[in-house]
Design a protein with these regions (language model features):
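Walker A/P-loop
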Residues: 32-52
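Conserved helicase NTPase catalytic core signature
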Residues: 1-17, 151, 168-268
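Pre-P-loop entry segment of helicase/translocase ATPase cores
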Residues: 1-31, 103-122, 127, 255-258
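The feature captures the helix immediately C-terminal to the Walker
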Residues: 27, 50-51, 74
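Gly/Ala-rich phosphate-binding loop of Rossmann-like dinucleotide-binding domains
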Residues: 53, 57, 81
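P-loop NTPase motor core
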Residues: 62, 70-174, 178, 183-218, ...
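Gly/Ser/Thr-rich loops at beta-strand to alpha-helix junctions
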Residues: 43-45, 69-72
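Conserved SAM-binding loop
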Residues: 65
Length: 268
């Protein structure tokens, strides 16, 4: 069995363009150390990834997002780095890494964020209180998503059993079924139907009721919490990183030092 976290993680969304399947994907991404999001064009993959990263940020979880091509990575970075709160760009701590050029752009971006937050005043206790307000709602949403996941599994099992019974009915003249086999399948179908009825239908609206709808307050949280993380780069423990960021070395050497710093797991 895959390793998983059992904690109920608050889901934090920057928009409401989302459905139950996407919420389930975000919820599962928080429970497992690795998530793979796939689907045909137009199914909301990019939006799901963005909201997964924002949810991870809200829960103090670091994310490495990778793709087989640059387009989704660039799209996600563009969206996360251009979020605004009351006309001001949110200094969201996200980096677009890659070749030498991309790493140089990342270094420049970090320094721009450092300058942006320099004079900001942040009241951590207020931010923490707003976060605590979401915990109970998160537990209820997590329980509802667990039921939705069970419904999907039950319906899949019911469909498989239905196909099997139809096949056996079609082949009844060429194969002989023992009476207890038919009875067992009928019992299994009844059991599946009973459990599906017990859980009931779960709609997108049901899940959305358990999400925080105060968008302005959430963007305020993102703005000041992001700024708090960026301001933390001025603390003594980040001296090595600051020396790299403030260095006048050639781009090649600067990128080499930055990459070496980022390779250490304790630095990310």
């Amino acid at each position: 069995e895959r390793p998983r976290r059992t904690k109920a993680y608050p889901i934090a969304l920057i928009n409401k363009n989302i459905n139950l399947d996407q919420l389930l994907a975000i919820n599962n991404a928080m429970k497992y150390p690795l998530a793979y999001i796939q689907g045909p064009p137009g199914t909301g993959k990019t939006n799901t990834i963005i909201n997964t990263i924002v949810t991870a940020f809200f829960n103090n979880v670091t994310v490495l997002f990778a793709s087989y091509n640059n387009v989704p990575i660039d799209n996600v970075f563009e969206k996360l780095s251009s979020m605004k709160y009351r006309g001001k760009t949110i200094p969201f701590p996200v980096l677009r890494l890659g070749n030498t050029e991309k790493v140089m752009e990342a270094i420049k971006y970090i320094n721009e964020l450092r300058t942006q937050v320099q004079s900001l005043q942040i009241f951590a206790s207020t931010l923490d209180k707003r976060k605590d307000d979401r915990i109970d709602r998160a537990k209820r949403l997590s329980a509802r998503l667990k039921e939705y996941e069970e419904i999907l599994d039950l319906k899949e099992r019911k469909e498989t059993l239905t196909h099997l019974m139809k096949y056996q009915e079609h082949m009844k003249n060429t194969m002989k079924l023992l009476p207890f086999q038919t009875d067992l399948q009928g019992y299994q179908m009844q059991k599946l139907d009973k459990r599906i009825a017990a859980i009931g239908e779960i709609s997108d609206a049901d899940a959305m009721q358990l999400l925080d709808r105060n968008e302005d307050e959430f963007y305020q949280y993102l703005f000041y919490t992001s700024a708090r993380y960026i301001k933390a780069l001025e603390e003594p423990k980040f001296q090595e990183l600051r020396q790299i960021l403030d260095s006048d070395e050639t781009p090649e050497k600067l990128v080499n030092e930055f990459n070496k710093y980022m390779r250490k797991s304790e630095n990310v």
